[in-house]
Amino acid sequence: MLQNLFEQIDTADNLLKITIFHLPADNEEYIRNLCQLKESVKEFFGSNAPLTAYVAQPCVTASMAAEVTYIPEGVEYERHDGYTLLHGDGFCELITQGITPTTPSAGIRQQSEEIFSQLSKMLAKHGFAICDIYRQWNYIEQITTIHNERQNYQEFNDARSRFYNNADWSNGYPAATGIGTSCGGVMIEVFAIRGTNVVNHAIDNPVQVAAHNYSQKVLTGKTDEAQRTTPKFERARIVGDVVYISGTAAIKGENSLQLDNATAQTEETMNIIKSLTATDNIPTECTATEYTLLRTYIKNSDEAAEVIKFMDERYPSVPKHYLIADVCRPELLIEIEGTAIIR
């Protein structure tokens, strides 16, 4: 199956990353598939082998799907084990593979701390600070499950907060997604950038409380911290001419909207994203924003067809990807992330 998928990909030298979405049976199969993916990529692409990430989420429209990223024209690059460095005019960027723990059956906090330790070493080796991270994906097995009064997502948030405590976030946190997977433990992907010749700003949403300012009442589970720590991310970031839209759900202020079906939540979520990406909300001069990708996570597979119908009718020309995944609050049925270009 991987061979057939790879044959559909342009094998140009500037291939940066392949993210595979597929549902394995369990953690053992996930580990086997991940090893096979890395070996197959090296065999098929040779010296131009891209970074890889394997997300344990089923696709709605196929048994396996891939998102493929290319290095922009004119950007020099260095391939390393587990990450790639991009060098442009006045900036350096670090793109990671999907970083996984050695033991995906360990506790969520232990896995998260191990991954953040790996990430810290990658960044430090090339002079990046933790606060240079501008986009982060956090895939968390059984994200809303509670073990011994501790919610998996809150365990991750506490580990992330401790990692982030070592950095100066005066320019805002990364854009981020925290989403559930069926298995595979914790997996994190990161984009980081440093340099003076680049636009890089946080974007707030006028209709939402910043996630890092949430009150204790919307956080779940027991914690070892003095209090439960908040999810440390911004609603979006603009880097260059690209707006990176964080995982967004039907939340106004800090409270989930009481909408009992996925299509209604999808419509409200896209209205919230419109507020976020409105030209008068972008902290740099622009006359228009244009979506270039919308990735939709759907909690219940039996609601997928209606969600797809809604999105395809409203956004027919935008590339879209539909996945089945649990969202960070039990009452939320949809989460949408994406990218947009400013004009």
Residue ranges and their predicted role:
Residues 1-137, 142-343:
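N-terminal presequence-like segments and the immediate start of the first folded domain
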